[in-house]
């Protein structure tokens, strides 16, 4: 027996996995369900885990696996008083994306996670597990610097970037400043200004007039090599 919100969240996650192969962010789930805070999403996910519908994959950010879906076509009864959907039957577990599906994406060069550095052109290809990529066109950049460490992005990591020229508040983006310097930062708007926020207290936010900043992509995933 699931609540209507649990049912709605489960299907939203599955739709995103089917479309892009990557779980939605907590912010996207919050907006999709019309909730005011992410804590409500945390509670819903925990409840779905306890009931065996959902599993969090260890050591991976934004990694959720739908284990089963309720068979709503055969038996759904909604009780408006307590907002509960009663479910009689669920199909077998869904197949996750194969872990060995590999896609090659262009490796453009290095990007600063500190202060902006020169953007690089194409040099080589990087083999990436398909599960780390969503829909759309992607490229990779090697991270240089430590200003995003509190977001789990470290020097030498490969940032997997979905090509885009727009960003939402709080997205981690590749921002091109003055047409020549690229940097990886959180994207914020302050009136007519763009603020590029680090994730390291040792660095200050960078503020620029909006016309000086061009979004070149949004962070889709990370690849880390251990030597």
Swiss-Prot record:
The keyword Transcription regulation applies. The active site is at 147 (for autocatalytic cleavage activity), 185 (for autocatalytic cleavage activity). The lineage of its organism: Bacteria, Pseudomonadati, Pseudomonadota, Alphaproteobacteria, Sphingomonadales. It comes from the Bacteria. Residues 26-46 bind DNA. HAMAP family: LexA (MF_00015). One of its GO terms (biological process) is proteolysis. GO terms for molecular function: DNA binding; serine-type endopeptidase activity. Represses a number of genes involved in the response to DNA damage (SOS response), including recA and lexA. In the presence of single-stranded DNA, RecA interacts with LexA causing an autocatalytic cleavage which disrupts the DNA-binding part of LexA, leading to derepression of the SOS regulon and eventually DNA repair. Homodimer. The record marks 113-114 as: Cleavage. Keywords: Autocatalytic cleavage, DNA damage, DNA repair, DNA replication, DNA-binding, Hydrolase, Repressor, SOS response, Transcription, Transcription regulation. It holds the Pfam family Peptidase_S24. NCBIfam families: lexA (TIGR00498). InterPro entries: LexA, LexA-like, LexA/Signal_pep-like_sf, LexA_DNA-bd_dom, LexA_repressor, Peptidase_S24_LexA, Peptidase_S24_S26A/B/C, WH-like_DNA-bd_sf. SUPFAM superfamilies: LexA/Signal peptidase, Winged helix' DNA-binding domain. It catalyses: Hydrolysis of Ala-|-Gly bond in repressor LexA. The keyword DNA-binding applies. Its EC number is 3.4.21.88. This is LexA repressor. Belongs to the peptidase S24 family.
């Amino acid at each position: 027996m699931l609540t209507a919100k649990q049912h709605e969240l489960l299907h939203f996650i599955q739709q995103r996995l089917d479309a892009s192969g990557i779980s939605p962010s907590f912010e996207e789930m919050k907006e999709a369900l019309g909730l005011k805070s992410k804590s409500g999403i945390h509670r819903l996910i925990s409840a779905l885990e306890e009931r065996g519908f959902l599993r969090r994959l260890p050591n991976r950010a934004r990694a959720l696996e739908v284990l089963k879906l309720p068979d709503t076509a055969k038996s759904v009864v909604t009780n408006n008083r307590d907002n509960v959907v009663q479910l009689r039957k669920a199909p077998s577990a869904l197949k996750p994306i194969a872990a060995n599906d590999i896609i090659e994406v262009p490796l453009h060069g290095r990007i600063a996670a500190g202060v902006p550095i020169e953007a690089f052109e194409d040099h080589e290809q990087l083999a990436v597990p398909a599960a780390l990529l969503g829909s759309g066109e992607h490229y990779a950049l090697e991270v240089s610097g430590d200003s995003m460490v509190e977001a789990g992005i470290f020097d030498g990591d490969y940032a997997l970037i979905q090509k885009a020229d727009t960003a939402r508040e709080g997205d981690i983006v590749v921002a091109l400043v003055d047409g020549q310097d690229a940097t990886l930062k959180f994207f914020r708007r302050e009136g007519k200004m763009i603020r590029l926020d680090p994730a390291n207290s040792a660095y200050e936010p960078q503020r620029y007039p909006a016309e000086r900043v061009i979004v070149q992509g949004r962070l889709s995933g990370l690849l880390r090599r251990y030597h």
